[in-house]
Amino acid sequence: MVWPFSRRSRKSIARIEVTGVIGAATRKRMLEALKEIEERRFPALLLRIDSPGGTVGDSQEIYTALQRLKDKLKIVASFGNISASGGVYIGMGANHIVANPGTITGSIGVILRGNNLERLLDKVGVSFKVIKSGPYKDILAFDRELTDPEKGILQELIDVSYSQFVKTVAEARHLSEETVRSFADGRIFTGEQALQLGVVDRLGSEEDARRWAAELAGLDPDKAECITFDEKKPLLRRLVPGGSSAGSGSMSGLAYPALAIPALNATLEWLEFERSTSGVPLWLYRP
């Protein structure tokens, strides 16, 4: 597509904000925005991340798209209040990373949770009859405890995903995998500590990151306009109070536009995310 304002774009900085838990809705929005940014030939992208992470596959797809785009423009990530786990992974797709001294980041690792309701079901007299093609077809079933072989299978899955995370951080930050593993044990740390560990490049605000992006693109930081690519919300969600999701991450892609209480809206979305990701490996910091 030929954009009528491409000349303006070449003198401006694109901006995308990633907030909330990363899921399918985040991925869809990000990929669409990155495609438009590429077509409009922006020279730089400011990637604002304020997310505790989310699903593994969606985080990986966003990272891959950023990697492809990095050959065509400069990308500077700005870590906000929290940029942990999958939020860190996405940030690895940038050329440079800026964090506030007090940013909560880290939580490099993988978590997988399932629910065991066996005792509750016994109390209410509910049981399930299962017919399956193999011994592991109902792994993480909520009506029974995991067997030792099942725990081994799931641990192997977690270990593979963890190794992928460590390798990406090591390559992006020019660190050895051994060094990354020394602090990639799920712990969180501040932006100041992240700088000491080599996870970020500088300490500073989003404005500092914007100015750096402008300089890298050969633009005047005092004159370069920043164009934000917001989530495209349906008209109803824009008109109804509380109609926007808890964050642009819109955890499961579901929203509750009829609710006028943002806190309740956010709680319902979180519960839906918990339900939909039970038994799914996550790059997510759970406070």
Regions found by a protein language model. Name each.
Residues 1-85, 92-100, 111-287:
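N-terminal organellar transit peptides
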